Every structure is written in C-alpha cells, then in structure tokens.
Amino acid sequence: GRVAIVTGAAQGIGRAIAETLAEAGADIVVADLDPTRSKETVAAVEKAGRKALNLKVNVADANDTKAMAEQILKDWGKIDILVNNAGITRDGLLLRMKEEDWNLVLQVNLNGTFHCTKAVLQPMTKQRYGRIVNIASIVGAMGNVGQANYAASKAAVIGFTKTVAREYASRNVTVNAVAPGFIDTAMTQGLSADVKEALQKQIPLARLGTPADIANAVR
C-alpha cells in the first residue's frame, strides 16, 4: 500500500480525504495541529483496514514538517502521497484587516504548503514516485469580499503548484491542485443564512459541496 500524508486531517475536507485514501488502500499519516481531534479520523482509517499515524504538526513551522517527514520515513520507510489540505481563514475587509491576520493566513496556507512539499520531495524524487495534491480554492481565481488574505494565499498555491509540477515531472512526481468552491464544513458553518442562500443561488446544483465531493476529486 501507499503511504499518504494528509494535513489538516482532523475534520472536514481533510478527514474525508484521509478516509477516502484509506478505502483506496493507503496507510495514512493524520497530520494536524490538534491530535486529540484527529482521533476520529484515525479510527475511520483503521476501520477501513489501514494503518494510521497520528502526528501533531504545525505546517507553518519548517522544523515541524521536517521532523514529520523524518518520523514517517523512520516508521514506515517511504512517503508516496502528500495532500496539503491544512488551511485557515481570518476574514475581514482590507482596511480593517490586522497585519497579524494577513500574516497568519499566508503562513499556514502558503508557507505550510511550501514547507510540507519541500519536506517530502527528497524521498519522492529518490524513489521516483510521488503524488502531491494541494487544496487551493476557487476564491484564489475569483476573489471574494472580505478574504484578501485567503484569496492571495490560494492564488499563490495555484502558482506554486504549476511551478513545482514543471520542476519534478521528470522524476515521476506529479503536483496538482484541487480548488473547492463553497463546501459544507466548520469553516462555512459560521456564515449567516442569508450569505449561504446567496451562495447557493450561484451554484448550478443549488447546494454547497460536501467534503466527500472534494475527497473523490483528490482520489
């Protein structure tokens, strides 16, 4: 079986991806800032008959991601798949946006993707096999009111994805992005009913997406 890392795997889209990859036969590294919340994901992976490694990882910290890769190689001997899913929002109109909220979103969403990707590229290129999937966002292409930081981070992830794909294709390491629209997760549950209704009117199916929709796209 393949060894797959899923960051931000404790809930929402990350959990759905971890479960789907386990069902497809991969052993899963459940990487999240909160390993207590990750226990449900671990249980689901094990229920699918695969191994799970529950690691506390702050993707914004390069030392953490490097230690994560070293731990996986020590325990399981290889890394085949990386899904860069960890992400946060700190919404606000630009004039009201605090610099710390701008920086934090970029650190997690963009720098986190950079750190994790860099940590796994060496073992992937060495074994001449790797699959990296970055979870971007449709907001990175369209923009969205109150999300200058988030939109900038996700637009950057798309550019990063295209570049790293070109750099490592010759080593049989593919790098792709999946850009979800509005998905029914804890991140969107904070939206008011009016905002949700307005969003649904823009969607042909007239509903928010589900984490399973995205997990199937990743698979």
Please provide the spans of the model-predicted regions.
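Residue(s) in the substrate-gating loop at a strand-loop-helix junction
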Residues: 137
